[in-house]
């Protein structure tokens, strides 16, 4: 009988320090097939693994390059992004080494600012009013095939897999919301346009995803884990307008939003605190970002390049068929 394993039902709330632009258009993504943290994550032919991951991201600091801009927060003109993401996944083990996976994110994004509405300056926004926009729904789905390079039955203490997949444009790349404007008489009215790229649900392109993940036992209770991916988006721009309809387009290059590449990498240690009870602790680091130029295809359009660095402490609990991470 085929086995069904419920794995990686986790809640992750991470405090992230962002370096780069004030808003980096990074969408929640992870490696497709489990955690690869140790040999216990191995699957056998015919097994299914169902996963659910949650991540909360709060962004409020501004950088220009590596230079932090505290004056934006002091003046109250900083942009604040809040994103909650659920990553739903299912993995099927074709053989001991070949895995097929599908992942679908569910995103709830909210953004507040001054400059996108009345403006930052006192003469146009005397009360310094802040307004919000949002985009909620499914993101871009991913289909991935991955392969353990070493025979899992012979290399229990260390192994790594490589994967190749497609990212499909199932998320709305032109999510709309209302933006506030202040008339000359001080009255308020709204216009509708696409929300900022940093909270869009999708990018509108078919991407090619290359990933790697693995583990290595270091000591009797300690193992190293690592994973990462690079997602290439050959499409140049999508049809989401970057410039508001009441503004003049001064640069045709950024009239529409760019369909940008994305990357991420994670590395950390997993320590078995109480092996018999299935309790462990993890400490890792994550970097994720958007490059200024794509690997394949054009790099036109408006994009928010930069990267986010996060520290990821955690506690895990494992049973015969379930693994929970917090």
Task: Walk through the language-model features, giving the residues of each.
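Outer membrane beta-barrel transmembrane domains
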Residues: 63-67, 72, 236-326
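Residues on the lipid-exposed face of transmembrane beta-strands in outer-membrane beta-barrel proteins
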Residues: 39-41, 52-54, 88-92, 102, ...
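Extracellular loop and loop/strand-boundary signature of outer-membrane beta-barrel proteins
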Residues: 37, 71-76, 125-133, 195-200, ...
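Surface-exposed strand-loop-strand hairpins of Gram-negative outer-membrane beta-barrel proteins
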Residues: 26, 56-85, 198-201
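Transmembrane beta-strands of outer-membrane beta-barrel pores
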Residues: 54-60, 104-110, 140, 149, ...
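Transmembrane beta-strands of outer-membrane beta-barrel proteins
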Residues: 48-52, 100-102, 143, 158-164, ...
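Short loop/turn motifs that connect adjacent beta-strands in outer-membrane beta-barrel proteins
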Residues: 21-24, 38-47, 59-61, 97, ...
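Residues that define the transmembrane beta-barrel architecture of outer-membrane proteins
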Residues: 46, 82-86, 127, 135-141, ...
